[in-house]
Amino acid sequence: MSDNMQIDSPSPQEIDEGLYSRQLYVLGKEAMLKMQNANVLIIGLNGLGIEIAKNIALAGVKSLSLYDPKPVSITDLSTQFFLSESEIGQPRDVASREKLAELNSYVPINVVDNIDEETLLKFKCIVSTNISLEEQVKINNITHANNIGYINADIKGLFGQIFVDFGDKFTVIDQTGEEPLSGIVSDIEKNGTVTMLDDNRHGLQDGDYVKFAEVEGMPKLNEGNPHKVEVLGPYAFKIKIDESYGEYVKGGLYTQVKVPKDLSFEPLTKQLAAPEYLISDFAKFDKPAQLHLGFQALHAFQTKHQGELPAPYNEQDATEAFRYAEELATQNPSILGEDKLDEKYLKELFYQARGDIPGVVAFYGGLIAQEVLKNCSSKFTPIKQWLYFDSLESLPSETEYPRNEENNKPIGSRYDGQIAVFGKAFQEKIANLKVFLVGSGAIGCEMLKNWAMMGLGSGPEGKIFITDNDSIEKSNLNRQFLFRPKDVGKNKSDVAALAVQQMNPDLKGKIDSKLDKVGPETEDIFDDKFWTQLNIVVNALDNVEARTYVDRRCVFYKKPLLESGTLGTKGNTQVVIPNLTESYSSSQDPPEKSIPLCTLRSFPNKIDHTIAWAKSLFQGYFAESPESVNLYLSQPNYVEQTLKQNPDIKGTLENISKYLNNRPYTFEDCIKWARQEFETKFNHDIQQLLYNFPPDAKTSTGAPFWSGPKRAPKPLEFDINNKDHLDFIIGGANLLAFIYGLKEPNATVDDFKKVLEQVIIEPFQPKSGVEIAATDAEAEEQANNLSGSIDDEQIRKIAASLPEPSTLAGYRLTPIEFEKDDDTNHHIEFITAASNCRALNYGIEIADAHKTKFIAGKIIPAIATTTALVTGLVCLELYKVVDGKDDIEQYKNGFINLALPFIGFSEPIKSPEGKYNNKKFDQIWDRFELNGDITLQELLDHFEKEEGLTISMLSYGVSLLYASFFPPKKVKDRLGLKLTSLIKEVSKKEVPSHVKNLIFEICCDDEEGEDVEVPYICVKL
């Protein structure tokens, strides 16, 4: 045994939320703490082994140990991104250790010098790759008997195999990782039928469990015991209750309860004979059984040939391996059942057995690492028990790239693993691609690593362009694995480019990294010349707006686009091919449900509502009001200008008056301000609401006003010993001091207490005539009335009370920009406190800063495993794009959820077809192309004569250049103008010099005089 195992180190430290922030939102604290107690061993440090190790190290287990004494060879460099030519001959595990250790300082990386039983028993989970079937059985017999998780995985070219065994009894605490469902009850019948309020869907399934709270008339139901659900429909479910539960009066909330589930796994020896498969592609339902025999046949071949696999595309070797598959099928006929062995399909596996494809490695590496995390944390449902996969559609066309023993033999290159599958000519094609990667965050880093292994862009004609205008933050390090702690603050694209050039020196000088955001404002940088040189565009973005823009450019320049995204354990990939598929923008997600205005202002019933209210309060206090003050101080005629645009001018001016006439001069003043605001928001405003709508108020129909989603609030009495009350004061005072540029003393809690004791609070006086909207319709009506009833006299009065800007020359406030990831800036502290105080008003369960940050910061949960997997799938599509496949059935859009686990594929949707005058056109990809800066008359004549179309309207951007209903003189004046002159005359702007294409939209009639939809016009200057 080596002495550096550190297996019995003390219990894990607290979770570093700065580092693991995004992953915590995927796994939760409980699962993370379990992982930090788990020791993991990886046997086999080829490309797949290192990919799994990388993902596990980033995720944060207690320790990660490696075993692979085999010496490094040149072919390892096909996918082993932490090895280089200088390490050839060294043991793989020793050579990989240091680079793995850099990924996460919380995870010690050890090398073990044997894998006897004593060593294996030290681990919670063991992964093996690339070992003999005999060794797998030996290891699994030990792990199964001792309840140690065991995963074996193998990759052969475009094929892959996973086996999972987590022992006789493995408990899954949370099968899906989804937030527990909850809702408001409108009725519970005596037979146990529960009905939802206001046609809200409950989303539950048969067998789910729920608990209840706040049900009036049924105290026994509120005791918190889980009840099993029988679904009656989308708006009702049934639970078992008897007469002892009492009779329903009103109210009630239900919340789903996650019930642990026990799973039982069989050892490898049993599963070899009677396998249980997870299907990865429903179009290949019969393939797992074929591959189950095929992979065993390869082990039989290796046994006969001293561990050697069949040579690439060697017919003799493939025939021998197929013979072993036939013998296995005869020995165990139940595996194939009625089916026959598919010789053509299995020979493809044998031909490719020495292949090592970066895309398959990334896909499987993400998948397997997530299985390890499931074993260590008991969170999410594991694979039972085999998963087979192939991506034969990625093979290039036989006619252009023939695959045979000569073309696919190794050439002593780092790309031999890829050449073994695709051949030398296709490898050259990959090397000479020009590819644009938009974004170098989590997906971008993984993509670049895959491309470095593929040799993409490394040839004489090749080039990789990257752009990202973001810099590296600590929370990125947990999944953007090309970055290290020393890189925090640097530009993502530059650091990523340097990192992959070290992985593959062939990329030196082949990467052009930019810091520019891709958008309309940078079309002079990403111009015609830039776009036309590209072969493929790949998105690695995290927002819809940027994705849509890149998609539009790809459609315009007719460039293939590979798109992907992740959300926690969910991921998707989409391939967009010119003149074949629809584009990214063709389909859209449904819009997010917004919180009704009256719910936000007066009737919250969920913590999400109070967090949204608190974020809005933060923006109002510390961003919008200071910005209004600065505009007033810097803009002449501010009041007159604002009157025209802002219906709530009165509220805006009152705020400016408060911020200038009552400005604080000391930090003590800031504390007093925060205390007064506490009283206003959490006491007086609540008392006013109850004055307008007393607890016993009734609606116009005689029903109780405070029922259903409306919860009657209680005013808060300030309590200095309540953490949320005090945090509101501390956060508020510090933020106010910041906007006024006051020095913030390092005030202690005692300092705050001293000042707070001196604050005099006026008692609440109810105001009559205060309108509070009880419904959204009322809120909308009030907003409309606001814009229609501006009281000039009142506004003049407030405006007159404002100090003259000239008396405050040069004086400005500093508006605060919300930043969620800095725990020292009081932003999240203040929002959490404000949200929790409001939750206390309404009897809603409060949330910690971690949850508040997630909702207020709109954080996208993320984990390295999903990212790796998704980029692997993208690279498998990339091979198809390089080959120029024009059969839509060969392409796959991927949909995965590692938590379930679910892997599904579908064909892309074909681009829609349009028609005019019996001519067909592609509604997405086709356009009318004209050359030269012609006149408007020439353009109209061309369409009349060549296309049989009479143009009735012509527009450029937002400018209408021509319409048949224009006055004759206007039309006459414009017909003789060149298009660029016409644009200048109408829009009052020159066409920028970098613009080489003018895009016009038209409305027109066909030969029958009917209005028809046609493509846009592109005029090349």
Swiss-Prot record:
Main location: cytoplasm
Pathway(s) the chain acts in: Protein modification; protein ubiquitination
Residues given in the record as ATP binding sites: R22, A442, D468, R479, K492, V518, D542, N543
EC number(s) from the headed UniProt entry: 6.2.1.45
GO MF, any single term: ATP binding
Pfam family, one: ThiF
Record-level GO BP terms: DNA damage response; ubiquitin-dependent protein catabolic process
Residues annotated as binding Mg(2+) 2: D542
Active-site residue list: C598 (glycyl thioester intermediate)
Keywords recorded for this protein, A-Z: ATP-binding, Cytoplasm, Ligase, Magnesium, Metal-binding, Nucleotide-binding, Nucleus, Ubl conjugation pathway
Note: There are two active sites within the E1 molecule, allowing it to accommodate two ubiquitin moieties at a time, with a new ubiquitin forming an adenylate intermediate as the previous one is transferred to the thiol site.
Family of this protein: Belongs to the ubiquitin-activating E1 family.
Assembly and oligomerization: Monomer.
The protein's name: Ubiquitin-activating enzyme E1 1
